[in-house]
């Protein structure tokens, strides 16, 4: 069942949707820009510096931050000529990926745009210090990128669909 995360984000005024995953084709009222490579995202960031872009857009939507981070990681690997970030010695791959992801995302609000980042969620089971298990809804975004996203976020919200007796969801 869909929750409408992208549809909700698309209601932000003058929004540009950077579609790292396809799922925005039926959403009206928002300008979608497909992103298939990190270099394409970096090109969009350059274009957003233009004053004309500020006339068109006030808010930038990243859909999803999970895939954006994966593409960032691939970009760092390609730059270094390796197939996985852990092939770079002394944790350089992880630190370069985190730095690139952080700097690119932070550049959006630094240019004066609002930033909306979308991730999926999952229900995970944890164990407390007394050995009791409990469930918590957490983003599917990995720990490294989540630290970056959390630090930048003013609001973190979770959405889930509610089904009415007549079968409608909202």
Language-model features and meaning:
Residues 84-100, 138-146:
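A short acidic, glycine-rich active-site loop
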Residues 62-92, 130:
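Conserved P-loop NTPase nucleotide-binding/switch module
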Residues 115-170:
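Phosphate-binding/switch region of NTP-binding enzymes
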Residues 100-112:
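Catalytic-core regions built around general acid/base machinery
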Residues 54-59, 111-117:
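Loop/turn-to-beta-strand initiation segments
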């Amino acid at each position: 069942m869909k929750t409408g995360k992208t549809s909700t984000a698309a209601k932000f005024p003058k929004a540009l949707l950077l579609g790292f995953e396809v799922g925005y084709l039926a959403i009206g009222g928002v300008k979608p820009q497909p992103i298939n490579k990190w270099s394409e995202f970096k090109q969009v960031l350059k274009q957003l510096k233009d004053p004309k872009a500020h006339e068109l857009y006030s808010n930038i939507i990243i859909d999803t931050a999970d895939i954006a981070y994966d593409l960032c990681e691939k970009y760092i690997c390609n730059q270094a000529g390796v197939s996985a970030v852990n092939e770079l010695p002394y944790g350089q791959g992880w630190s370069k990926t985190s730095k690139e992801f952080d700097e690119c995302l932070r550049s959006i609000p630094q240019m004066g745009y609002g930033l909306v980042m979308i991730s999926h969620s999952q229900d995970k089971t944890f164990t407390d210090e007394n050995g009791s298990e409990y469930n918590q809804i957490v983003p599917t975004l990995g720990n490294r990128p989540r630290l970056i996203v959390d630090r930048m976020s003013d609001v973190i919200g979770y959405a889930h669909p509610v089904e009415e007796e007549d079968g409608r969801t909202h």
